[in-house]
């Protein structure tokens, strides 16, 4: 990664999305 801040922010956002989709699988099933 060229920019550490951007890389970290990207990974953090992905992790947050995963964490948010896990407990709400029944609400939005199949939606990314």
Curated annotation (Swiss-Prot):
PROSITE patterns: CALCITONIN. It is found in: Secreted. The modification Proline amide is found at residue 32. GO terms for cellular component: extracellular region. InterPro entries: Calcitonin (IPR021118), Calcitonin/adrenomedullin (IPR021116), Calcitonin_CS (IPR018360), Calcitonin_peptide-like (IPR001693). GO terms for molecular function: hormone activity. Disulfide bonds join 1-7. Keywords: Amidation, Disulfide bond, Hormone, Secreted. It comes from the Eukaryota. Belongs to the calcitonin family. Causes a rapid but short-lived drop in the level of calcium and phosphate in blood by promoting the incorporation of those ions in the bones. This is Calcitonin.
């Amino acid at each position: 990664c060229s920019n550490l801040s951007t890389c970290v922010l990207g990974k953090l956002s992905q992790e947050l999305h995963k964490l948010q989709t896990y407990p709400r699988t029944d609400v939005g099933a199949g939606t990314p």
